[in-house]
């Protein structure tokens, strides 16, 4: 039985019913409907911390999904799982894939910046200030892009950019 049919959460069930109705009404392919079902089941598993199951569903959704915009959110969710599991290298890889398909995704840019900032902090703690500065510059690069897309968000990042003197760095978009 698909995860979406065994979910006990009222809101998730309501969303599932509404989404299924919309998919029945809209003229979309069977493949698109299947991709959405896997994506939805992946989100459900992810919200319950069942990351292995979520990844299986997301990979199947990626295989079936044809729309680049929809695929970008699947890549983003896969990146979130890898971030939660502490695999920053894989997380960055999937955030990049999401951004390749959807460059206007400030949350992916922010999450990449957070990873680079954390890596910079680790390098600083280990006394490698040159590496720390390079990683902080990477964090600034991604935070500035995120802030350009969502200027009312990421207030802490904006403050960090100002206090570290990185708010004036030129970045290529």
Swiss-Prot record:
Tell me one GO biological process term. Answer: photosynthesis
Q: Where in the cell is it found?
A: Plastid, Cyanelle thylakoid membrane
Signal peptide residue numbers: none
Q: Membrane-spanning regions, if any? A: none
Listed GO cellular component terms? cyanelle thylakoid membrane
Topology in the lipid bilayer: Peripheral membrane protein
Question: Per UniProt, which keywords does this protein have?
Answer: Cyanelle, Membrane, Photosynthesis, Plastid, Repeat, Thylakoid, TPR repeat
Give a yes or no for keyword Repeat in this entry. Answer: yes
PROSITE patterns from the UniProt entry? TPR, TPR_REGION
Q: What is its main location?
A: plastid
Q: Where are the TPR repeats?
A: 35-68, 72-105, 120-153
A Pfam family matched in the record: TPR_11
Give the family from UniProt. Belongs to the Ycf3 family.
Describe the function of this protein: Essential for the assembly of the photosystem I (PSI) complex. May act as a chaperone-like factor to guide the assembly of the PSI subunits.
Which NCBIfam families does the record cross-reference, listed alphabetically?
PRK02603.1
Q: What is this protein called?
A: Photosystem I assembly protein Ycf3
> Which species?
Cyanophora paradoxa
Give the gene that encodes this protein: ycf3
